[in-house]
Structures are given as structure tokens and as C-alpha cells.
Amino acid sequence: MLNRRILLTSAALAPLAALRTAGASAGVAKPVSIRLPRPTGPFPVGTTELHLVDASRDDPFVPGRRRELMISIWYPASRLTALAPYLPPLTADVFGEGAAIALQQPVGTIDWVGAKSHAGLLAPVCPGMRPVVLFSPGFGVPRGLASISVAELASRGYVVVTVDHTYEVSGVEFPGNRIEVQTLPPAPYAMLARTTRFADLRFVLDSLTRLARGDNPDAERRRLPHGLGNILDLGRIGAYGHSAGGLSSIDLLVADPRIRAAIDLDGELGYGYDDPADAPTVAKGTNRPFLLMGSGAIGPGPHDHPTDPSWGLFWDHSTGWKRDLNIPNGRHYSFVDYQALIPWFQRFFTVPEELIANTVGTANANQVLRAMRTYIPAFFDQHLRHRPHDWNHALPETKFIA
């Protein structure tokens, strides 16, 4: 049970985050376009990307290279511009070939490369100090696959920074039409991934400090939206993530005082340890606010703190505000864009039943999306903006464990 949710990508869902496969060809006359729900907040959303190079750190996955990352910054805009791609084109190409395997459809059935987000590329910044939220994706999953919740937060006045963890994810596109694909050392590599993610996120925080001071941390010093650094309120930073990204967010909450609150979306906290009690994050706990959001049964029971020992120990060792929310009929990928994408694909072709069961389960998709777009902003509103939320009444398809 210990790592089943973090490593699910390597099992039933592996092709959705897989490497490029040989012999790909497409004879699809009219590819299916991606359609995602629009954000509901009052602000248009803008986005830009940055290439970050950590000159102080060698890459643990590829010796002899400095660690480099790609991040996206989503922010409240004053007006919408031409929409940014859903995924960078080279990333979309790699991801699409893997997705075709999982969906049992020819490559090209879905137009991943042409898909658009709901954010304007380099849109003008809406002035005003904004709380900042980091997002870390699951193991092997591109940062763009959480666009629904990310755009929702940005439309409600947050600056959201999404991070690709290079060489762990299926493919990361860098400037100059360069892509770095998944490059993992021989197993076991769980501890390496955990410590690397933690260092990645701390480096991103340092880079945001540079940006707020007026510097441009992009390695190529590409143009950024005017005034982007001026809206970063680095005294109000939260973090959230899915699967391994949820673990990374809680690691950061416990160890880095810059993080004031965090959400873990279905990520077990004992990753890399035979006994979850040995994980420093679990053993230490926190006095800062956190929200656990777990899925339904994959194994002995639902993912909640009474069932998952790593969640239970962390819960017992933590003394601050805490909530445990479960989606009983959802599954591990109900917390990211698959919850909307898979029902959309079902309109055009048959999606394998096993894939549905292992990714989003049987929960009503619209209700799960409603819950995600309610509880994530509500949590950060309460703890970064001092806007209380009533946590006593669960929405449909959700259950409060504690």
C-alpha cells in the first residue's frame, strides 16, 4: 500500500506519461480537440514560462549537468491575449504517443499539440499584490495536466507556479526546441526523487524572490509580462500537489518556513521509506495548516488518515489546523485534468474500462470538478487571505473524514 498511489503512473496509467514510442503514425482524419472547463473566477488568466538553471547543483539524474527546470507562472491578467498551448508542442508530442497506447487509439486521434489552455500567453498583468501558490505534479506527469485547478486559482486572484521535475516527467521542453525525456537510474530511486523534488521547489522559491526583487531569473532572460514580479506577495505562499507532488508539498510545508499552508492530493507521505514512521516529515508533523484529499479504494480501503499509516502518523504529530477529505468513488487521477478529459474522450471513442476504473473511478465528473474548484481555493482563501470557509458540509461525491 505504501507507495501505490505515487507509483500508479508506472502501472495502469504508465502510457499516459510514457516516453516516445517507435513507429508512431497517424491516419486520423479529424483529431479530437481537447476541451476543458473554463475557470470561474473574476479575472482573466495570463501565463508565461521560465527556464531556470541551478548553478549550485548538479543534476542527480544526469551527472555532469547543472539542474535545470521549466516552470509556468499563471496569474490574474487585465485582459486575455492569444491562448497559450495546453502543453508545449514537443511535450505534447511525447505525451500524445504514450496516451494513444493507454487509450488504445491510433496516434493522432487526439490533438494534444493543438490543444489550448484557458490562459493568455504573456497577457498583461492585473496590478495588486497576490498570494503565491506552488504546484508540483505527480511522478512522471507534465505540469500542464493540472490546468483546471491552476487556472481556477489564477482566475480568483492567485499567482500559481507549476513545476516540471526534469528527467522524472515523460518529457520537458526547453528553449531552442530541446526536449529532455524521462531518464531514471536503476531502482530503487524513490528517495532520490523525493530529495530532488524538495530541492527543486526550494530553488523555485529562491527564483521567485529574485523575480520579486526586479531580476529576471529566466536563463535566456526572455521577456516577461511587465510588472509580474511586482504582484508576488512572498509573505503569503502556499503549496499543493498531486501524488508525489502532494508529498513534496507537505515536505516543503514542514521544512521551509516560507510555506504557510499546503494541500496533499492523494500522495502518500512515506515514499522512499520501508516504514513511514522513519520519514522525517511524518515523524515531525507540523503546526501549520494542511488539507489531505484522498481517493476511494485502491487496495485495502479509501485513502484517508485512518487507513494510510503515513497520513495517520503525520496527522497525529501535527497540532495546527487540519482536514481530511475523501472522494469515495474517485480514483487517483480524479484530482487532475483526467477527471474532465476522460469523460470528454468517451464522447468520441470507447475508453478502456480498466483505464477508467484506475484513473477516475465512477464518481460524477462534474461533481468532482466542482469539489476541486471549491475546496482548493477555499483552503488557500482561509489560510492565505483570512477568508473563513464552512468545512462542516460536504459537497456531493465528497466525505469529510475529520
Give residue spans per PLM region.
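Short substrate-entry loop that stabilizes the transition state in hydrolases
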Residues: V125-R130, F139-G171
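Short glycine-enriched nucleophile-adjacent loop
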Residues: G246-A255
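Alpha/beta-hydrolase-fold serine-hydrolase catalytic core, especially in secreted/extracellular enzymes
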Residues: V32, P37, A55, N329-A402
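N-terminal export signals
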Residues: I6-A26
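The feature captures the conserved acid-bearing segment of alpha/beta-hydrolase catalytic domains
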Residues: A261-H332
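Gly/Ala-rich beta-loop-alpha elbow adjacent to hydrolase catalytic centers
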Residues: G241-G245
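Domain-level recognition of soluble alpha/beta enzyme cores
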Residues: G27-V132, E354-A365
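Alpha/beta-hydrolase active-site loop
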Residues: V181-N230
